[in-house]
Amino acid sequence: MLDNAMQYSHRLLSEVVQPGDCVVDATMGNGHDTLFLSDLVQSSGKVFSFDVQSQALEQTRTLFEKNQHSLDNVELIHASHDQIQKYVSQTITGAVFNLGYLPGGDKTIITHSESTIAAVQQCLAQSQIGGRTILVCYYGHPGGKEELEQLLSFVTDLDQHEFSCLRYEFINQINNPPILLCIERKK
């Protein structure tokens, strides 16, 4: 069976992220990617996880407690992902974005292309060669299609000599299945 967007994002990250690496979860949400990344980098690595909603930080802490998983290698940051460079000075191996709204949260609080593109630019600037920035774009909500279009325009215009860009989507599914974009630094 083909991987769904979330499964594929995890596969793409697990191919490059190693114990001891520094990674970013740009949209913490319910904490599932943060937990996954924490396992990948292990105790010697670091996960910087961002969200503008305090509810996301609470749900992530709860998820870690429920899984009896330490937060020692994780920094939960109550800030927009366009503040990454304010908090992360290290070179990063991977970054993941789940764009849209917090599942189970306020559907009027959504990601926006301006802050997302700024955050992606920051991740790319700090990415090591071979590092990957993953964007899982949920676009079935108001404002979602506009964000997707602007992100596609941004990613399409990246220099092919510096980055390889992948688009992964299911083209025969209804209800706006998420589209995954992967940007890998080449040099």
Regions found by a protein language model. Give the residues of each.
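S-adenosyl-L-methionine
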Residues: 1-21, 35, 39, 57-93
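Helix-to-beta-strand junctions that scaffold the AdoMet/dcAdoMet cofactor pocket
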Residues: 18, 41-42, 127-129
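Conserved beta-strand signature within the Rossmann-like core of class I S-adenosyl-L-methionine
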Residues: 27, 126-137
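Conserved glycine-rich SAM-binding loop
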Residues: 29-31
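Conserved SAM-binding motif I beta-strand of class I
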Residues: 46-51
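Mobile active-site "lid"/loop adjacent to the S-adenosyl-L-methionine
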Residues: 97-119
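Class I S-adenosyl-L-methionine
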Residues: 144-187
